[in-house]
Amino acid sequence: GIIHSSLGGSEIAAWLPRQVINANNSFRTLRGNHWLDSPLISDWVRGRARKNISPRLNQGSPDHPYKPAFLYESGIAWTTPLPITGVIWYQGESDAEIIDNAQNGMLLKTMISSWRKAFRNPEMPFVMIQLPRINDPSKIRAGWPEFREMQDTVAKTVPQVYSVNTIDLGSTNADVHPPFKRPVGERAGNTALNKVYGKKVPCEGPAFKAFKTSGSSILVQMEHAAGLTTTDGKKPAQFEIAGTDGIYHPATAEITNRKGGTAVIRLSSPEVKSPKNARYCWNRFVTPNLVNGNQLPARPFRTDAPVLKK
């Protein structure tokens, strides 16, 4: 069975145990009413909370669902005696307003480690839904590409954490709630079946492995790419390349050198004579068409990502 514990718009801070917040000096601004001015909390969340509780602020420290530790204490803490196998984690739309991979990654990894300790399971699996696409031009959605990257980085560096790609399933409008719920659940379920229960169920889409420059082209090697193709029969879309100036331009992409589970994509653009870097689906809203033989979409990536501390 599945125990459902969630609240729309909540940030990771609300899901952290209070003792973790109190013990970590990096979280000092999350304590008491300081959280309403904390740089670790997005403007939207702080604004919504102030609107809800401002009449009672002078009476002490009123609770709010977005308050740090509130959702952990009111929900997760009560389930820690249960033999939970793992967690399906779908959250981050509010955190992504703060474009800081180091900060968001630190919060996410802290939450994962604290839950594992609370459940007395140091390897408790986390199946994490990567933020999908959203067709919303507002400022608060600008950091979604970076947040997706952070989620993938955590999945690559923290054992038993898995990132579920949903880049093709989000809204074609500004609705933060993706309309296509079933495929999200199926991908999360298949990831759990494969990674946690050892079932031979496809769950990996094409993912960046390596790249190199070749004259006026960039060659991108993809893994989990058996049967690599496009859903519309056209060339792969949403690729961009940049030269030394760092300005990205749309790239023509051609699938080459399919071999086993890997394939190479050649990228070029008349605007970039000497390319240095490439990226894929690096925007809040994209219309991707690149999939493998299991019809699972390719993961967003960029080759010039900053190196973050583990």
Predicted regions mapped to residue ranges:
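Cell-envelope and extracellular/periplasmic
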Residues: 1-310
